[in-house]
Amino acid sequence: MERFDVDAFKVFDKQWALVSAGTPEDYNTMTISWGGLGTLWSRPVATVYVKPIRYTYEYLEKNEYFTVSFFPEEYKMDLGVLGSKSGRDGDKVALTGLHAVKAENSVTFREASATLLCKKIYWQDLDPAQMPAEVIDTYYKTEAAHRMYIGEVVGIIR
């Protein structure tokens, strides 16, 4: 696999990314600012976190593959739109300058500078019983905890 060099502590939190699942004809995507890159079971992996109330959750549940796409700074406003609108309410991608394209077994965007094609190898709901009280107060007072998806990175699209 080719090399993928990023600042792992900034690429999600400061730059943001899109997690997407489905096909270019039937998919959903959402902006994420929580995630991780690493190694699990001697495989390169990407980890993302999605709440069950999000429309993208449904697509992650029914698809074996997902993508994590990174963008140049000029698309940050588009990512802001995709993080604040729901695909349940209409074609939110049409409100942006992004264009969905096929990514082998999933979907990405023509404008992405890099996309990780991921095969789901593990998922688990985060357990509030194992969280500090201030995390629950800040993130989970009124909504269910995130589901963690770990995907083996099976390809990098540039």
Task: Give short role names for the model-derived ranges.
Residues 1-32, 36-158:
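Active-site-proximal mixed secondary-structure blocks
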